């Protein structure tokens, strides 16, 4: 019997279905799911990452898995404050927290080496790219296929489409162009409105993000304090967005506004918005970065891996990290890991 999620994709069974893993996001977010010692947290991170892949593979009839990894990011050169807050947070870690973080990165490298060397999954990384760039690039390079993005990152909302879904194994939440669904396939209820959470509007969500900035990535707002819905005397995001294509009064009224920051520097909204588009829009990277994205994907897929006995290799990996629950169902976990990329 087909699952709920397979019904979402009715009529497009001839397409390939790629499971695209935001690897570091999934692995490191999983550490916060359980309390306990470092071994417990590492075990949970491994389990949730592999289980997310297995579940997405089964629910969406996957055909190939792609693990996307982080580089330093070109955005730090384009915009100096980008993710500077992450380093500030690391500098504030206690000795115990710092040691735990180091161990997690070491284990993550072990996991990365396993999927790179012992499975047929495509694994992509470039020193200048973030996983977001590679995931978006893969979707854009395979427009006639289906894609399931495994991540908790809200940045992927802009990619949601009839052929692109996002799944969080940590929250057991699925986001499609039709709405937000829990693990049973039921629509998610918005905690504020007490009503069904409306389906995402990718284009407006991206516009709002470029206007408001992103505190988690230290991307500053283009227009601090801007309202979503305007008032009688002031244009809001909704009105400006509706006027985006025609570039009429409401658009210009907002974009030509000026404001002064805490250091006395004057900003024009349009200038900061344009900067944020380059930082946030996963179709708007600079031309040289777009070339790197394309080249990285082509290099990763030119010679698809042909690794044999992936199931046995998984069993050895499970034994090394004491993952008995996964070892007991190794055939189900191995299936997505042994599927080759077909050109």
Residue ranges with predicted function:
Residues 16-150, 156-181, 189, 281, ...:
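Noncatalytic, basic helical substrate-engagement surface that gates or grips nucleic-acid strands
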Residues 3-14:
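Short, Lys/Arg-enriched N-terminal segments with co-localized hydrophobic residues
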Residues 1-4, 203:
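Generic N-terminal initiation segments characterized by hydrophobic and/or small/turn-forming residues
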Residues 16, 55, 59-69, 84-92, ...:
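Non-catalytic nucleic-acid-binding/docking modules located in mid-to-C-terminal regions
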